[in-house]
Amino acid sequence: VTQSVIRAALELLSDKIYKIILYGSYARGDFDLESDVDIMIILDCSLEEIRAYRKEVSRIASRISLANDIEVSLLLIDRRSFEERLDILPFYQNVLREGVALYG
């Protein structure tokens, strides 16, 4: 599943990708049959560009979910916002601390 996400993300977003991080239960190793695969894609681009990609990224997540019979959640964020939120929001701190870098 993660390799499919990386391939699709690189095809769509190529040089804009800063990092791809697997986070949540699959990254921690405490997943079960009901768990989804949580992946954050951090981009070096503007918020406007991210908005333009959201619909296609949602399609990618749906396609991979259906093909693998598992829910795939893809979260897009720009690098600047991610770094700003790191200092104040525990969610982003957890992603960085517990996450597994898949790319970048």
Enumerate the predicted regions with their spans:
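Catalytic core of pol beta-like nucleotidyltransferases
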Residues: V1-K19, A27-L33, D44-G104
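Short beta-strand->loop micro-motif that forms the acidic, two-metal-ion catalytic signature
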Residues: V37-I42
